[in-house]
Amino acid sequence: MQVAATDIDQVFAHTTNLASCNLNSKILACSNDYFASADNLLTPTPSISRPGVFVHTGAWYDGWETRRHNPDPYDWAVIKLGVAAAYIHGVEVDTAHFIGNYGEKAELQATHAPEGSGVTDAQIADPSFAGWKTLLPASPCGPSQRHGWKFDAEISQTPYTHFRLLMYPDGGFARLRLYGHAIPPPAPAIQAASAPVEELSSALNGGVALAASDEHFTPSSNILLPGRGKDMGDGWETARSRAAGHVDWAIVKLGLSGSVSKVVIDTKDFRGNFPRAVRVHGLVAGAGGDGVPSADDANWVEIVKGDKRCQADTEHIFGPDDLTAGGEDTRVFSHVKLTLVPDGGVKRFRIFGRRA
C-alpha cells in the first residue's frame, strides 16, 4: 500500500529505520555508482543539496547516482542489515534533490540468510543470486520527493537480513529507509540465573522510542543507537523550556523485556545544553496495557533513585547501589521512561539487565 509523503513519519512512527549506517547496515555491492556512492543511501540524516559544487565526475549529489545509458533494465544495490534479522513493515525511497536525474522506478527484494545459514555475503552480492523475494514490485518514482509503501502482514511478519534495491533504468536515489523492528539474537541455552547481562534497550535488540515530549532539534530514537556517536547531531535534544517545573521525557519499549542491573545515560558532546538532572522509571510487563503508555501513567515505577545530577560530556553509570531496588531489580520491565530535568540533550540511554 502506498503511503503519502506527508504521512510517512506518522505511519512508521513506532518503527526503526534499519537501513542506516548508524545501525551498522552496509552496502555489499552495487551495479554502478559512478556519480555518487551507494553508501549514501544509508546515511541517517536527510539528504542535502550543494548547488554549483562539482567534483571530478560532475555535480556533487548526496545520494546514489549511476552513469547514464544503462544497457541493462535496471541498476541495483545490495544491502546487509546491521542487526541479526528484522521484520520490515515498510520502505521509503527518497529522491530528494534528484530532479533531472532521478530513477524512474524502484523495486525492493529481500532474503533471509542469517549467520550460520550457509549462504555467504559474497553469494548474496553476486548478480546471479537467485534467492531474492520481491517485496515491492517496480513502482513509479518522481523527482525530489519521498515515496513510501507499507507492507502487508505476510511480508511484515517474515524475517529478512539482506535487501536488493533496483532502480529503473538508471539515475539517482537519495535515501533508502527500511522501517521495522530488529529481531534480537536468540537467547543462550543456559539457566536463567546464569543468563548474561544484555543491553535490553538497544535498537540492535529491537528497542524502539515510542514517544517523546519534544524533539525540536533531534529525534529521541537516537538515544538507542549503538556506540557513543560522532557529534551532538546523533543524540536527542529538546527545545529550551521557559515554564517553571518543566520536564521533558522519552518513552522506550525495550527490545528485550527483563530485569535491570545497570542504567547508562551519556551526555557526550552535550556541553552547554545537558540536562540538570535525569530520572528513570519503568513499566513492569503487562502493567501498561497495549499501545503507547502515557507519560503520566500511574503504573510507572522508579528504577533509579530520585533525580540524578548530570555533567557535561559524561557517561553517567548508575549501578546496583543507585537502583531503587538496592541491587538488580528482578522485576520484568517492558518499557522505560527517561525524564530530563528540565530539558536539554543526551546522547545515549542504555538499560542493561537479563532478558526474561
Tell me the role of every PLM-derived stretch.
Residues 78, 90, 164, 251, ...:
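Beta-strand secondary-structure signal
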Residues 70-83, 237-256:
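Short beta-strands within extracellular/lumenal beta-sheet-rich domains
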Residues 1-71, 89, 97-128, 144, ...:
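Juxtadomain low-complexity/linker regions and immediately adjacent membrane-anchoring helices
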Residues 80-86, 228-231, 253-258, 328:
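Helix-boundary capping/turn motifs
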Residues 249-269:
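C-terminal, well-structured subdomains that either form a transmembrane helix-short loop-helix hairpin
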Residues 76-80, 85, 92-98, 111:
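N-terminal low-complexity, intrinsically disordered tails enriched in Ser/Pro/Gly
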Residues 117-151, 291-324:
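Beta-rich interaction modules in large eukaryotic scaffold/regulatory proteins
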